[in-house]
Every structure is written in C-alpha cells, then in structure tokens.
Amino acid sequence: MPLRPRLLLLCLWGLLLQQAETDSEGQTTGELYQRWERYARECEETLTAADPPSGMVCNGSFDMYVCWDYTAANTTAQASCPWYLPWYRHVAAGYVFRQCGSDGQWGPWRDHTQCENPEKNGAFQDQRLILERLQVVYTVGYSLSLGTLLLALLILSLFRRLHCTRNYIHMNVFLSFMLRAVAILTRDRLLPTLGPYPGDRTLTLRNQALAACRTAQIVTQYCVGANYTWLLVEGVYLHHLLVIVGGSEKGHFRCYLLLGWGAPALFVIPWVIVRYLLENTQCWERNEVKAIWWIIRTPILITILINFFIFIRILGILVSKLRTRQMRCPDYRLRLARSTLTLVPLLGVHEVVFAPVTEEQAEGTLRFAKLAFEIFLSSFQGFLVSVLYCFINKEVQSEIRRSWRHRVLHLSLRDERPCPHAELGPQALPSRSAPREVPITGSTLPSGPLHGPGEEVLESYC
C-alpha cells in the first residue's frame, strides 16, 4: 500500500478506535477491522462493476471512510453512513456529504457529522464551547497586544536618543509579536470561511482557496517560530552583556538579525516539504502525524529551555549583586520579585510550565488546562512586554518628557511677540537657550543604582 494512503488509514483507524473504546456493541478491534476490510472490498467490487457516466464526473472511490459513487461535476454527493461503524444502528439513516468540483475533482472536505457516535456528541459540544471561549480570549489578547506593540515600536523608532543595540533588539521583538498576532488573527479569519462546519453541505474549497489557506498556515508557523527565536536573542544578548562582555552594549547586531529572522526558516521549510509529501491533507491545521509536527516543536522547545537556563543564571547574578549591596530583607525580596516578574514575559519563561507535557500526553482536563494557560499568556505576552519595556521604562518616559518640554518651549517662543512701545533691553529679551540636557543612559531606581560591571544592564532590564 502506498505511504500516503497508509498514513490516512492509520489516522482513520486511530479515530475509530478512540470512539469505539467504550462501545456497547460488543465488537472487538479485530472484528471491527474485518468489517472495515469487507466494506472496502465490496466498495471496490461495486465500483468495478458500475459503468462510469458520460461527461465530466468525479471518479468513484473509497476514501478510507466511506464509498463514493461516480458523481456529476459541480454537485454535492451523498453516501449512507458506512455500516462497519460500531454505532451504525444509531446512524443508519444518516449521510456523508462531499462536493464534486466543476473540474471533476473531489473537494478535500467531507461532512460526516450525521455518522458520528451520538454518545459522544454531548462531550463534543462541551469541548467545542470551551474552545470557542478560548478563541475569544486570545483574539482579545492578540488585538490588544497588536495595538500597544505598534505604539511602542513607533516610540522607539521616532526618538533617536533611544536608538541603541538593546532597543533595536526590543524593536525586533515587538515586530515579531506583531507578526505573530497578525498571522494568527488572519488565519482564524480564513479558516471559518474556507473550512466547512457541520450542516454546511454545499461549501467547497477550491484549489486557489486551499493554497491560500495552507500559505496562511506556513506564514503563521514562521511568525510563531520567529517570535520564539527573538525571545532567545533577548536572552542571549542579555547573558552576553552580563557574563561575557561585562556591561558593554556593543553586540553583533547582524548576527542577531540573522538568528532572529533566519533560524525559523531552517525548520519551517523542512516541515513544509515533509508535510506536503506525507500529510498533504485539508488546510494543514491538524497534526495527525505527530512525528511531522515535532519538526517544528523541537526547535521551539529548545529555545524555551535555553531561555529558562539564561533566566536562572541572570537571577543568580542579580541575587549575588543584591547581597553585595547588603540590602535590607524587604527591599531585597521586593527587588528580586520585581526583576523576576519583569524578565518572565521578555524571555518567555512561562512556557516552561507545560513544556514537558507533549501533545500526546495532554488529554482531558490537562489538555484544556494547558491550552488555557498557553493561549492566555501567549496572547497577552506582547502587551506585557510593550508596557514593561516601553511605556513604564524610565528611559523612555524621560525622553518623552524632554521632547514635550522642548515642544512647549518652542510654541511659547513662537507665539511671543515684542511690544513696540516697551522699552527693550537685555532683561526683556527671552532666553533662546534650552535647558541643559542630561544624557540618558538608562533608568534608575529609587533604591539607588547598582555598582560594578553589568549593573547598568540590570538597571535597564530589571
């Protein structure tokens, strides 16, 4: 049997076994498989004996689930629920629907909701309701993050005094969060219109629409991967400043750009090739063959673990420096807690919580807990990063206040006009010199600056 039909058979067989594991019909796995084989054999015999109709038609075939007869082009075919299903007596009157395109090719989707196990429908509806609510949550989160990230990116771009390697990396992190949000929101807009829902028997997915849908999936995977690699760049750069260089902000920015935007292509492109060759089904939104999904999942897990170890190392450095300053216990704990909470969203440390739990292990309550945790924090992560590293950053606030003061002074000097009857003198002339500007090198804390190599870096980040 060719590899692709074999994979489809394995996926179908796993689905049937999952639904039949609590079946009350008394069939064993061997009996179910024998019934399926007999159904497939009878389908082939029926199609061989039948005479294909004239004109443009979709060929009769067995798609590993149900037997399809020859169908005229641009019509919706229907087939009775396959009798090998363990719960067939409950769905004997049901049908499976599939669209035959105008080009004589079967559409990739089929509607088999009338043939599903009725005992599982209640649980399915509950799960669907939970997923719909989670979708609302992350839609709000990504939309909010997109707006704040755009504003933060404009602020760091417009104020030249804020231009430095550290903020350049921040800007790329903001951009990666924005691309991730746009890609996910766009994909969600495409899937409901391109993918049929239960009861929609006439919807079909044309070749162009299918290509657009898969392209959206590819772009989404790249943007998500780029987001994780740029979080890794933040961790590597901060570790480089604190441990290797000892406080210098002069880094190899081109290498960081190559790592942040180039590394995701190293695992997204192989995933696209393997997916196209071995699991080229529907819109690529389902990962039935887990081995293919691990091509993308493995590099992301590696970036999460590396950033977690960097996070632990930075906390160790911070603890040692705070102890050196002999801070009082309340101040010590407050500073450590604030630094921890500040670095968690920037490095994506929260991902470690469910990183050991694979997709295969996550079932039932654990699966929904993992989804809720990751979806909520990932969607609002961009919002938190933009607030912590732009809007409440003391360096950014100082630059905005300085620019505002200069703007107000400029307007007041422009509107002020000399009086012709007044006695002019040196004391009556307004001063044209601006207040002395103090170079901004980083944010300072009320507890006072740290001293020593790398201290200014910790002040800027923590």
Curated annotation (Swiss-Prot):
Taxonomic classification: Eukaryota, Metazoa, Chordata, Craniata, Vertebrata
Main location: membrane
PTM section of the record: N-glycosylation is required for cell surface expression and lengthens receptor half-life by preventing degradation in the ER.
Subunit structure, interactors included: May form homodimers and heterodimers with GLP1R.
Ranges facing Cytoplasmic side: 159-166, 240-251, 317-338, 396-462
Any single biological process term in GO: adenylate cyclase-modulating G protein-coupled receptor signaling pathway
Compartments reported by the entry: Cell membrane
Protein's UniProt name: Gastric inhibitory polypeptide receptor
Keyword Disulfide bond annotated: yes
Glycan-bearing residues: 59, 74
Signal sequence bounds: 1-18
Keywords attached to this entry: Cell membrane, Disulfide bond, G-protein coupled receptor, Glycoprotein, Membrane, Receptor, Signal, Transducer, Transmembrane, Transmembrane helix
Membrane side Extracellular: residue ranges: 19-135, 187-214, 276-290, 360-374
